[in-house]
């Protein structure tokens, strides 16, 4: 991680002009304010590791005041309320949570490991820690002929917490997956 941060620090825009600004002791006219951690869902990492990553980010980019990342609803369930508050204090905010849907039947079928009540519980905990979040919603995940019912179930749940965004996405189905076979069987 530290090597990636060093590389980003040097290559952010025009490395030559950035180097001159730094050597002349001038303030960067366009400092980095937000870092977004990529990968499947970095928020699943233990709090200690997330704090270590935040420390490195602030070391190499002291102007950063927001650290975002992808997350699952179950990630915050594995953290205490105090840990969530601590993570917010070091900059974690603006999480992108792949809730997928709030259709409990679809969540169970997809073996997501949570239900619509868990979405509400964990979002409330994030809000109490002042951590803002947005949702990724997978259209069509409720199955053949169930799209409207799934969308309505999701709307009922998604209208209760306060996501800054609900972004619809498509689901990628790989031929070697169980879901692909379900689709082939007309489900």
Model-derived features: positions:
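Conserved C-terminal portion of the radical SAM core fold
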Residues: 94, 117-179
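Conserved SAM/AdoMet-binding glycine-rich loop
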Residues: 4-128, 132
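C-terminal accessory regions of radical SAM enzymes
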Residues: 180-187
């Amino acid at each position: 991680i530290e090597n990636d941060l060093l590389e980003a620090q040097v290559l952010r825009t025009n490395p030559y002009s950035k180097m001159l600004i730094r050597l002349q002791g001038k303030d960067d006219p366009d400092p980095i304010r937000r870092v977004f951690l990529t990968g499947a869902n970095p928020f699943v990492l233990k709090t200690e590791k997330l704090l270590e990553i935040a420390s490195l980010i602030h070391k190499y980019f002291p102007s950063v005041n927001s650290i975002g990342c992808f997350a699952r609803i179950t990630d915050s369930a594995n953290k205490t309320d105090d840990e969530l508050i601590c993570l917010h204090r070091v900059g974690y905010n603006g999480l992108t949570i792949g809730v997928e849907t709030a259709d409990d039947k679809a969540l169970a079928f997809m073996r997501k490991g949570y239900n619509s009540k868990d979405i509400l519980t964990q979002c409330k905990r994030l809000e109490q820690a002042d951590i803002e979040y947005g949702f990724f919603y997978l259209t069509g995940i409720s199955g053949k002929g169930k799209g409207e019912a799934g969308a309505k179930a999701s709307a009922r749940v998604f209208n209760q917490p306060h996501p800054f965004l609900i972004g619809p996405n498509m689901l990628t189905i790989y031929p070697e997956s169980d879901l692909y076979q379900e689709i082939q069987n007309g489900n």
